[in-house]
């Protein structure tokens, strides 16, 4: 029995579950979405909260430029570029016999400095918020000071009295670990069984304590939570339920709007924007989507992408069970090459806050991710890790979803003028030998 019903009963009441359980690639576009002006109220956070996070990152920019020289050219702002994907677009058009395809772009969070993934946004913001709170309370700085003062030995010794803990499949651990250690915190990253060895090695090389677990992501998070609960000096970064992570991700939207302006990309009712976001527990894509909805309103359509073996957010929202269920409850194993997306139980906070703002969800097989990795690398010279490719089939899924397109009332002209944005969540820091092994696998599937 699953929450009082047999699997057969679930499949009758929620037909898509049959395909999810069979590990088939599946798409679901939520008929229950609402206008942004109404649905944004569900979130419990506001544009002012996002502005506060943005201002905080601005205050810390001189510090970041000092301690991470690779951020100095951008003045200490951790941001990624956008790039067109013309060859990949052509491939998708041919594969799906697509008509009315707009343009296809990449948001290259894979190239973000410091930790090389989307998690540099939320993870670094939350650590900086905690550091700022401590430093202000202790009188180390005032809000108008030059925050490069926090790079001093005195500041590092002060932060060294405190601990930070987090549970991660890899990329969040990298961002939290590297940033916390740089400030001087004692930091522990609880890693799930699917975390890549190179990510653990990189953390240890940065002075981070890595605690390895034989179980999946949810257990790693719980262990981190327990460590912090037993130690008053330890701050726990809760990937399943963190407004500060969420807000750090949301800041991306205002910066993307500027990049679109510079590239001459229009976003409005006649020029819709579709954004494809790989989804694990949901904090990263949820936060980015929240920011996008604040900036672009009903002109942006956010779609979450998950592995066929870990469709936790799709399952949670589709059934209405959210974090009360896991993919394992339905006999799905949560074992995937997309390590950053290997999450069995979704964030209840994100699922409930964002369910009326996310247009749809789809799943993609590991084999497809490997194959797309090769195509993206060879055609458009893009280096992405497996989980970061999950957004690539999005344009195909949307343009083949006739019922969804009709429900939204899109005209052929609107679709021709649309922008499709793949959020490339990580990959630049994958070691060359590991990346070559991925490519070899992609060529063999």
UniProtKB/Swiss-Prot annotation:
Sample GO molecular function, one term: pyridoxal phosphate binding
Gene3D superfamilies: 3.40.50.1100
Keywords attached to this entry: Lyase, Pyridoxal phosphate
Disulfide-bond pairs as recorded: none
Family annotation (Pfam families): PALP (PF00291)
Chain positions found as N6-(pyridoxal phosphate)lysine: 119
Domain of life: Bacteria
InterPro entries: D_Ser_am_lyase (IPR011780), Ser/Thr_Dehydratase (IPR050147), Ser/Thr_deHydtase_PyrdxlP-BS (IPR000634), TrpB-like_PALP (IPR001926), TrpB-like_PALP_sf (IPR036052)
Biological-process GO terms, alphabetical: D-serine catabolic process; isoleucine biosynthetic process
Name of the protein this chain belongs to: Probable D-serine dehydratase
PROSITE patterns named in the record: DEHYDRATASE_SER_THR (PS00165)
């Amino acid at each position: 029995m699953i929450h009082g019903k047999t699997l057969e009963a679930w499949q009758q009441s929620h037909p898509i579950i049959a395909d999810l359980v069979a590990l088939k690639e599946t798409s679901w576009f939520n008929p229950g979405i609402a206008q942004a002006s109404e649905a944004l109220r569900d979130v419990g956070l506001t544009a002012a909260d996002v502005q506060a996070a943005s201002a905080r990152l601005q205050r810390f920019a001189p510090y970041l430029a000092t301690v991470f020289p690779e951020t100095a050219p951008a003045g200490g702002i951790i941001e990624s570029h956008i790039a067109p994907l013309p060859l990949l677009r052509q491939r998708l058009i041919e594969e799906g016999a697509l008509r009315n395809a707009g343009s296809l772009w990449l948001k290259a969070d894979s190239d973000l400095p410091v930790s090389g993934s989307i998690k540099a946004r939320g993870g670094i913001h939350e650590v900086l918020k905690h550091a700022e709170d401590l430093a202000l309370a202790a009188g180390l700085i005032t809000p108008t000071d030059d925050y490069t003062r926090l790079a001093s030995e005195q500041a590092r010794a002060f932060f060294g009295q405190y601990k930070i803990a987090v549970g991660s499949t890899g990329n969040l651990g990298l961002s939290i670990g590297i940033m916390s250690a740089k400030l001087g915190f004692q930091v522990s990253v609880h890693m799930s069984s699917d975390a890549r060895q190179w990510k653990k090695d990189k953390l240890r090389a940065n002075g981070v304590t890595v605690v390895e677990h034989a179980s999946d992501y949810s257990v790693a998070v719980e262990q981190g939570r327990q460590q912090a609960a037993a130690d008053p000096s330890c701050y726990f970064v809760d990937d399943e339920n963190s407004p500060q992570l969420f807000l750090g991700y949301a800041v991306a939207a205002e910066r993307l709007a500027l990049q679109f302006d510079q590239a001459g990309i229009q976003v409005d009712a006649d020029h819709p924007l579709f954004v494809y976001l790989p989804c694990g527990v949901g904090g990263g894509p949820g936060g980015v989507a929240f920011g996008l909805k604040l900036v672009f309103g009903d002109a942006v359509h956010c779609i979450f992408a998950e592995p066929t073996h870990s469709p936790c957010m799709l399952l949670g929202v589709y059934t209405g069970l959210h974090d009360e269920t896991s993919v394992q409850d339905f006999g799905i194993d949560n074992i995937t090459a997309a390590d950053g997306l290997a999450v069995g139980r979704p964030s209840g906070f994100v699922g409930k806050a964002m369910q009326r703002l996310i247009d749809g969800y789809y799943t993609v097989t590991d084999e497809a991710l490997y194959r797309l990795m090769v195509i993206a690398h060879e055609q458009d010279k893009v280096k992405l890790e497996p989980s970061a490719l999950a957004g690539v089939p999005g344009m195909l899924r949307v343009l083949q979803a006739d019922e969804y397109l009709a429900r939204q009332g899109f005209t052929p002209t609107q679709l021709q003028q649309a922008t499709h944005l793949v959020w490339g969540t990580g990959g630049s820091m994958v070691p060359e030998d590991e990346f070559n092994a991925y490519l070899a696998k992609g060529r063999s599937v």
